[in-house]
């Protein structure tokens, strides 16, 4: 699925995303993550990077069903802040986390450029999310 320009702008605006994975017992596991948008021949993917094999990584490897919410910073004239809700299918890729985190740090936490990720960071993991459905409140629905 290809996201529209407004959804792309929100993702690139330096706002956090909330990622929901499923624990083995079916209960939700919620994490705040940084995501970047990457275009592939099959459509857009959201990519989150992790230096360690956190629970969200283990959960997504076991059950790839995930949901993300990205909340806008400005509600404009609306009564509710716009938000982008995405359901998708995750796949875990080993390696590549430092490069993605370096790019995301420039937008999300520029004061840490050159400091995060650390130079000796492990290769880590990428969560690559194929977008199955887009909802929320905003010009992307």
Across the structure, where does each feature detected by a protein language model lie?
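Charged, gly/pro-rich active-site loop segments
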Residues: 2, 77-141
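A short, aromatic/hydrophobic, helix- or strand-capping loop or linear motif
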Residues: 21-23, 69-73, 112-120
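Short, basic/aromatic recognition patches
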Residues: 1-18
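Solvent-exposed residues in well-ordered beta-strands and their adjoining turns
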Residues: 38, 51, 71, 91-93, ...
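Short beta-strand segments
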Residues: 15-52, 68-70, 82
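Short, solvent-exposed aromatic-acidic interface loops
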Residues: 50-55, 107-110
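Short coil-to-beta transition motif at edge beta-strands of beta-rich domains
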Residues: 13, 63-66
């Amino acid at each position: 699925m290809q996201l529209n320009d407004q959804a792309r702008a929100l993702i690139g605006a330096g706002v956090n995303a909330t990622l929901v994975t499923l624990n083995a017992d079916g209960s939700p596991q919620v994490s705040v993550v940084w995501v970047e948008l990457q275009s592939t021949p099959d459509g857009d993917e959201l990519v989150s990077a992790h230096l360690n094999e956190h629970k969200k990584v283990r959960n997504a490897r076991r059950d790839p069903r995930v949901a993300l919410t990205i909340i806008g910073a400005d509600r404009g004239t609306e009564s509710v802040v716009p938000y982008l809700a995405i359901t998708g299918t995750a796949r875990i890729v080993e390696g590549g986390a430092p490069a993605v985190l370096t790019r995301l740090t420039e937008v999300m936490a520029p004061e840490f450029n050159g400091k995060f990720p650390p130079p000796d960071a492990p290769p880590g993991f990428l969560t690559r999310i194929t977008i199955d459905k887009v909802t929320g409140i905003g010009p992307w629905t």
